[in-house]
Amino acid sequence: MKYRKFIILVLSILIILPVSTLDGHHIANADDDSPKKLKYKENSALALNYHRVRKANFLNNFIYFFSSSKEIKNYSVSQSQFESQIKWLKSHDAKFLTLKEFLYYKKKGKFPKRSVWINFDDMDETIYENAYPILKKYKIPATGFIITGHVGEENFHNLDMISKKELKEMYKTGLWEFETHTHDLHNLSKNNKSKLMKASEATIIKDLNKSEKYLTKNFKKSQKTIAYPYGLMNDDKLPVIKKAGLKYGFSLEEKAVTPNSNDYYIPRILISDDAFEHLIKRWDGFHEKDET
């Protein structure tokens, strides 16, 4: 009887997941989800973006392999996959940068070879439970883009968000920096448009000022950056972003970062297991020989 209930539960999840938007990130994806090889340019860096890091248990693995949900396939990796990716990067002499270092080298016009910046959007509990211990173990710096108005909230678009206490614990390690993912504009309107993209100038500035105040109060000075919800921004809204005092904006795009990358459209590569295998491992920056 218990087995039958379990099967019914799993089947129900598989039916629901493909139509659930969770946090709606899938709208930023192109129709063609197959990863291409990254174009390599000298003097470039990789900004690797993560959203969910799943526990590798039977139920999660079952759902992953049998679900058609883009949220699960494209916006999550398992804990074991995440650790394997970190170990691969270390074995290929990646130079892990903090956000502060990443922005410094970009502004200076010269990235160290094999520069990698690890970052996370939303900051739900899976990051604290499954990614944070691995990064701490290997002493890898990372940046978390927080939806500051929903810290500690349960069931925010089907996600349990990290608490302030947990964020402060992470911050005290010296490995984490936290930036804004808006205060309360990470949402979709009724017609599936980003709330940030539809909001008025006054609403956006008020929201981003609230977020900046939260970050400054709890984590000292921020770097004045934003990860756009769903990775989306356009030129019409950029003057408002600048007026709010933000100096850099991050999108989601399968490109390496160069010093010439637009400061308000800095590309980050959304990491899934497939993306890491096809894009990151094949990036020529990890295979070029050092000058002797």
From Swiss-Prot:
It holds the Pfam family Polysacc_deac_1. Its main location: secreted. Residues 1-28 form the signal peptide. Residues 114-292 form the NodB homology domain. In strain COL, the gene icaC is interrupted by a natural frameshift. PANTHER family: POLY-BETA-1,6-N-ACETYL-D-GLUCOSAMINE N-DEACETYLASE (PTHR34216:SF3), PTHR34216. This is Poly-beta-1,6-N-acetyl-D-glucosamine N-deacetylase. It comes from Staphylococcus aureus (strain COL). The lineage of its organism: Bacteria, Bacillati, Bacillota, Bacilli, Bacillales.
